[in-house]
Amino acid sequence: MTIAEQIRTIAADARQAAIAMAKLPTTAKNDLLMAMAMALISNTPHLIDENRKDLEAGEKKGLSSAMLDRLMLDEARIKAMADGLREVAGLPDPVGEVTRMWKRPNNLMVGKMRIPLGVIGIIYEARPNVTADAAALCLKAGNSVILRGGSEAIHSNLAIARILGEEMERAGIPKAALSVIPFPEREGVLEMLKQEEFIDLIIPRGGESLIRFVVEHSKIPVIKHYKGVCHVFVDASADFDMAERIVVNAKVQRPGVCNALETLLIHKDVAEAFIPRIAATLTDLKVELRGDDCVRQFAPQAKKATEEDWQAEYLELILAVRVVDGLNEAIDHINAYGSLHTEAIVTRDYHNSQRFIREVNSSTVLVNASTRFADGNQLGLGAEIGISTTKLHSFGPMGLEDLTTTKFIVYGDGQVRQ
């Protein structure tokens, strides 16, 4: 069979398997995930051997040290994958939950019940752990999942999927509910994105270029997250100690993640007092500052910011800083340059905090807290499949519930429409 024919078969089989997955009781899904976790641990030497093939190929290709690090599996990372499966097993099962129930004047009882989405396609880059993480979340939510990882991790991904699939067979669960596209060629991705007859949703996880490629070529709905241009606004009433703590944490703790701070906005009334303080602290922490003229007046070490800086996702120790006239300009700036990801205000003014929450058009908005909390675990969702900056079907960090949809359920007693 051609690649196109094989991928169509994988997708069709996943659709059939999704029917069985939707019927699985919670205990069966949890038992499966626990067995999968044990299987990963017991197959650690095999996984490391398969991963070594990817690492050796990556070194020959000249992959960067950072890419090779993301690609690498060792005992600790395999244990972390297994722990992740156990964590998902411990999460509440959203499938079958009745989220609302109301009574109509004709005594009909109407409700909404959570059901699986069906078949979910995950397209991701060279992170073998995503194979286990994404599979666990999709399966727990009663879905089939089709995985297409980066070609750099092909041996690792296939090995992980094979081990997990063996546990599904032992449990009497259709193995087709978990598939990996085995073709490293880009044609495999393109054919996967054509299977709108069988796949309900595509979730790409990776850099902006990957996500734009998927969106451009997909016939299937896509959950998008292009980049994280996250802001903190220090209001005129802000507590400076709190503001400094939040800014440092948001920028410095992990600068290479999507919920790290990229642009700092400061109210003009506190610019003279706060900018020298925060600039000195950040400079000591090796952060390069890029500011407007007002910022550079109080922090001469800052480079002159350009228009591109206001829309940049640096993912490194660089911070754009701007002085604004007040809350209105801060909100306008965020809504103009932000990426609908995560924004925070530091303020003691309740009215300003509520306006910021209502008017900032992003998926996570915080008051007096670091942008680093925009994460499924930190927000109490448990493990997350990703962060969506698409308002349909989900907005913000996506947990198990976001891998389901709802249907109407109606209880009657013989009513007919008049």
Swiss-Prot record:
Keyword set, alphabetical order: Amino-acid biosynthesis, Cytoplasm, NADP, Oxidoreductase, Proline biosynthesis
- E.C. code: 1.2.1.41
The main place the protein resides is cytoplasm
Gene Ontology MF, one: NADP binding
Q: Does the keyword NADP apply?
A: yes
The disulfides recorded in the entry are none
Q: Which domain of life is it from?
A: Bacteria
Q: Where in the cell is it found?
A: Cytoplasm
Which InterPro entries would you find in this protein's record?
A: Ald_DH/histidinol_DH (IPR016161), Ald_DH_C (IPR016163), Ald_DH_N (IPR016162), Aldehyde_DH_dom (IPR015590), G-glutamylP_reductase_CS (IPR020593), Glu-5-SA_DH (IPR012134), GPR_dom (IPR000965)
GO cellular component assignments: cytoplasm
Gene3D superfamilies, per this entry?
A: Aldehyde Dehydrogenase, Chain A, domain 1 (3.40.605.10), Aldehyde Dehydrogenase, Chain A, domain 2 (3.40.309.10)
**BP terms from Gene Ontology:** L-proline biosynthetic process
Query: Which top class of enzyme applies to this chain?
Result: oxidoreductase
| Catalytic reaction equation(s) | L-glutamate 5-semialdehyde + phosphate + NADP(+) = L-glutamyl 5-phosphate + NADPH + H(+)
Pathway this chain belongs to? Amino-acid biosynthesis; L-proline biosynthesis; L-glutamate 5-semialdehyde from L-glutamate: step 2/2
Q: Pfam families attached here? A: Aldedh
Q: What does this protein do?
A: Catalyzes the NADPH-dependent reduction of L-glutamate 5-phosphate into L-glutamate 5-semialdehyde and phosphate. The product spontaneously undergoes cyclization to form 1-pyrroline-5-carboxylate.
**Which family, according to the similarity comment?**
Belongs to the gamma-glutamyl phosphate reductase family.
Q: What is this protein called?
A: Gamma-glutamyl phosphate reductase
Q: Which organism is it from?
A: Geobacter metallireducens (strain ATCC 53774 / DSM 7210 / GS-15)
Provide the gene name from the record.
proA
